[in-house]
């Protein structure tokens, strides 16, 4: 039946005429000569069928009989790739006026069918121009498998895109007269809309240059392409709707040689996947024939994210799940309608992963049991305690040297305005014991090493901003819940007052664990700790709690330089909130060459006494510092002018006699003048400073509390 449908009148009429001529020749051969008797079985000449007689048509073989144009047995060719998608082919010869040909009634041999037609013209009979059929057929593996060429750009949801300007090239002159307009009954087949796009109005303003494809014509176009152009023009003139206009202009369903919307006449079949002008054969176009707004393949282009970055505390994987998907789930859409591909600039996931690693490393600091070697220690901890503490005459006990913690934890998650990944900032070499006012998040019970308690905080705590009417008993009652304590303030014994005179006091706890409990109960605001205290007239007034972290007493800036007491200065009147790291930064900014800074603390309570020391790595910086005599300390809320003196030791021998004249005793005097800068015993000082120009030098002696002072020298 399919072979019957593929035959055309143009092929059957010459066959019928040839058979009629053969019958006439046979009749002439069988006709008797004049005067002979006629055989009874020979038909008369009057009974010979005429070509014009309609009775000759049934006499033909069933294989050569064409179907009636408008008969009841008329069938329509369906697509072998898409069932239900029919084609209509206007005949190449003009039909009689009384019998208009319906679309799809017959198909010409030039129509490229995937079925064998038995013809010998491979170019005209192939479904796609330029591919030779195999045994009258064409292999389907020649087509891309991931995109069906049935759905061309005209069948996409953007079917209403204007593409008229790409068909301005006039078709070659047709050898046959143009077809008349299609009858009205053929239009309903073109009125079908895509269910995905009920209206094409929003896409009417899109330029056809962005989505259309210029047809590539061959040097020898077939006659069927001319018929297609003529039929398209006729259909465009008779169409009334916008859909009909786009359909007829694109000739998607009315062109006999171009029945598929994604193909043009004479085009290389491998370019049927939406190849633009200038694109090589076999290269997929960046436009998808299903939808021009989408790409048919996964893109490797990294798109900038459209949506704001997620919260930094949201735990998720580094890479998106669909970063390397091969289907259309990772398409790059112009408006980012789908989840974006992997963005290398999207660093919030990496930061979360690093924070999780740091949080895991810091778990031992949150109340867990420590190994026998002690808690983790930073490199600055070990560097200072193992390399420099002995030279300064300071004895520290250092547990945890076997368990080194590389990252500083003193301000992890506590200090506002800093990155949790880089907590060092100005204290980049500070150890891991925590900030004095920022340690509540890292507080833990007192560390123990072989049964020996290791303290983290001074047992003396500053409390500021107290209510003016609060007395000693009320202060004690407010903080007694943390442990036994004594309330003190400056000149308390002499004042004989029960109220702190300046609104601040000191809490002297009996146990260091009480200080840690107090820190845990405080609230943090802008890097400071507060606790609510009530008085007879004021209820729940926030007061500032300022503990002193023992690790803030010393800071090593340059561990490669040895500490020389002859290059160390004494800084008096240092504000108590100032830490060693801040003192080192100020001095290094002023004079340079700072390798160590320390805060003098009380030997019993280990609370700052208001003085500090700074060691330099070179003589020039040391002389510049002591020559200035005064320096302005400015840091945050601190702005104070302090005095600078040479740091005097009490265990130095005389630099002149090396103890020979004083019986091996330590030198009691130190000359701070830049022309001397030496230790002298009494005999050597008298002999050296009796010379001209040195009689006005004043000696420095070390008094209690490591504070040097000038003393008058008594001449004998």
Swiss-Prot record:
Classification via SMART domains: RRM
Basic and acidic residues bias locations: 1-11
TM regions (residue ranges): none
Regulation: induction: Up-regulated following synaptic activity (at protein level). Up-regulated in granular cells of the dentate gyrus and the pyramidal cells of CA1 and CA3 after kainate-induced seizures.
Compartments in which it is found: Cytoplasm; Nucleus; Synapse; Cell projection, Dendrite
Sites annotated Cleavage: 459-460
Polar residues biased stretches: 107-118
Bias type Pro residues, positions: 91-100, 169-186
Ranges where the record places region Disordered: 1-118, 162-209
Function: Sequence-specific RNA-binding protein which acts as a translational repressor in the basal unstimulated state but, following neuronal stimulation, acts as a translational activator. In contrast to CPEB1, does not bind to the cytoplasmic polyadenylation element (CPE), a uridine-rich sequence element within the mRNA 3'-UTR, but binds to a U-rich loop within a stem-loop structure. Required for the consolidation and maintenance of hippocampal-based long term memory. In the basal state, binds to the mRNA 3'-UTR of the glutamate receptors GRIA1 and GRIA2 and negatively regulates their translation.
Similarity comment: Belongs to the RRM CPEB family.
Protein name in UniProt: Cytoplasmic polyadenylation element-binding protein 3
Name of the coding gene: Cpeb3
